[in-house]
Swiss-Prot record:
Keywords: Electron transport, Membrane, Mitochondrion, Mitochondrion inner membrane, NAD, Respiratory chain, Translocase, Transmembrane, Transmembrane helix, Transport, Ubiquinone
Protein name, entry field: NADH-ubiquinone oxidoreductase chain 4L
Species, as recorded: Sigmodon hispidus (Hispid cotton rat)
Family recorded in the similarity comment: Belongs to the complex I subunit 4L family.
One GO BP annotation of this record: ATP synthesis coupled electron transport
Chain segments annotated as coiled-coil in the UniProt record: none
Domain of life: Eukaryota
Amino acid sequence: MISSTTNIILAFMFSLLGTFMFRSHLMSTLLCLEGMMLSLFILTAFSSLSSQSMIMYSLPIVILVFAACEAAIGLALLAMISSTYGTDYVQNLNLLQC
């Protein structure tokens, strides 16, 4: 269990690192955010199974709801930016003009 928890934490850290490294493209950033949410979901599912608290059993479902909302908003923004500017390259956007 310890090695799987370590692997999940490493997956979260690599996704966080990918978010910082590939922040110029919106699609890459969204994929890294989904990796972070997936690792958080698996980590909370493991921790809710190991603890015997009834409150912890609903936490993975709440994280899945937030991940679905984040994915929907991210894809809507990606579609809007791609149709408006023709690319997902974030460095070309001037957010003060939006």
